[in-house]
Amino acid sequence: SAASDVYKRQAVKSMIVKNVNEVEEVASHVDFVFSAVDMSKDEIKKIEEDYAKTETPVVSNNSAHRWTPDVPMVVPEINPEHFEVIESQKKRLGTTKGFIAVKPNCSIQSYAPVLTAWKEFEPYEVVATTYQAISGAGKTFKDWPEMEGNIIPYIGGEEEKSEQEPLRLWGHIEDGVIVKAETPVITTQCIRVPVLNGHTAAVFVKFKKKPTKEQLIEKLVNFSGLPQELELPSAPKQMIQYLEEDNRPQVREDVDYENGMGISVGRLREDTVYDYKFVGLSHNTVRGAAGGAVLCAETLKAVSYTHLTLP
């Protein structure tokens, strides 16, 4: 509402911005930290652990801890059970309440939930090309004018993340650490396109148990997880929508589906080389970043891993 927006602006107006390195000082004023900082990977690893050691839970958008064996990397609809690894992480850090949880890269949100919905058909080979918005680089057209009318066929580090991070989401806990899944094999190309918000993916899939198109669509529209079951505030009611029109999903039409927390899928059809192909779209700064982190925090609160009282 307008009244609540005014209240929020007033609340922010009186906040004092502090230096991230003043760990004890900052931690004394908060009971939760969202981390999205522009530092080196080693610096991020250390600062996030420093905050956790003050008994402050950390949910991170950074990539630094995504492969730390006892740090859960979670999309709450896909692998909330990975939060259980927090107990062994706390032992390592020597904490009772403090820990780090991370969310995966924005590039995989357009296809990882889709492949999860189809897991009973055993996808084993995936080719994905992502078309990624400039906000993923923290830019707008005003400060990146050379992106107007342009495409850049390379985004540093993005292809490795897009190929490997889904396997960690689908992994399992063994001896207090997360062991990644071995399949499916995923190969990607990640391309920067002149779009402000919204990552699109063109994806080809082979299945061990080839389903019908109708079965695939049914799995998509009925896909839900713990956030939907718990009716968490940021959770989309229907995580994945399927669009029948040949010209959808489109960024302009569909990127804000479910307030940017849902995934839009279209153009599902049989393929001559692979079994099926489709196009997926997600909001890279909402589901893919800030919103995904908030949903992680809400899920952690709901499953009693934190001492928080979230609104």
Residue ranges of model-derived segments:
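Active-site-lining helix/loop region of Rossmann-like oxidoreductase modules
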Residues: 8-12, 109-224, 228
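A structured beta-alpha segment of the ubiquitous adenosine-cofactor-binding alpha/beta core
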Residues: 9-45
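Conserved acidic residues
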Residues: 31, 56, 98
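Receiver (REC) domain switch-region micro-motif
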Residues: 33, 58, 203
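Short alpha-helices
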Residues: 89-122
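C-terminal active-site/capping subdomain that shapes the small-molecule cofactor and substrate pocket
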Residues: 190, 197, 201-304
